[in-house]
């Protein structure tokens, strides 16, 4: 039976005049349709993901296609059981993705070669190729292409500095890069070319498109794909499922993401339900004892109950440390 909701993912680098006005108008339109999601608009284009019913998303896609700026924009469609977002945000930004460059890259003028899923699959098996994950560390940790390089970064804007510090792994190689939907690689691959790397290619349509391709069927992808909505992760490889994620607390195989219960921290952690409850969904002692701890509030734990759990954790840590 066909699911009644969809999640759309899309981007287009295209000049947008008066992006502030367009942002306000687009927010009103999305709310009128009843969509939920997050959309960024800048003078360089649009980058969005929204959820809604089949009827709502059909109307939205029709409206986008009627706008000459977005008529050729590919839209990735996932079936869903319900909304994947809690609110509808359309925000104006100076740039669609932030590399924090003094001299920004325009993907319409400079970007890496686009490879289809089949081409990417074949190329990444070549010994003279290096595959760079253009996403953040927590995205990589729950799933990635087999053999891909994991930049030690928490945000996209840290990537250029990391590349400069580790350029020896790229020199003399054919470079492949990938991200969730493709929007980050458009700019990142262009930056790589400007830095002097000659053979630079990107996965057209990103991981999401790769996982839906009928020929490659997500092969050579291990784990799940992190997504920025309430689903948190989605499957990619249709032929085998290799778990690469590890529980933050125990190191055991796991693919379940939670956020640290201390809102001042909000760290993304992979954790089983057992670990979540045992450690009060908190990444550290400081977060567990924070006055703002949401886990404590959500489960109505008394001070005595909190202290009991802290004592158990402390005792186990003392034993493990010998």
Curated annotation (Swiss-Prot):
Leader sequence residues: none
GO annotation (BP), single: tRNA modification
UniProt entry tagged with the keyword Oxidoreductase: yes
Disulfide bonds: none
InterPro entries reported for this sequence: Rhodanese-like_dom, Rhodanese-like_dom_sf, Rhodanese_C, TrhO, TRHO_N
Residues of the Rhodanese domain: 125-219
Chain's role: Catalyzes oxygen-dependent 5-hydroxyuridine (ho5U) modification at position 34 in tRNAs.
Active-site residues (renumbered): 179 (cysteine persulfide intermediate)
Record keywords: Oxidoreductase, tRNA processing
KW Hydrolase (keyword) present: no
E.C. number: 1.14.-.-
Gene Ontology MF terms in the entry: oxidoreductase activity, acting on paired donors, with incorporation or reduction of molecular oxygen
Xref: HAMAP family: TrhO
Reaction(s) catalysed by this chain's protein: uridine(34) in tRNA + AH2 + O2 = 5-hydroxyuridine(34) in tRNA + A + H2O
Pfam family, one: Rhodanese
Family: Belongs to the TrhO family.
Protein name: tRNA uridine(34) hydroxylase
NCBIfam families membership: PRK00142.1-3 (NF001135)
Top-rank lineage group of the source organism: Bacteria
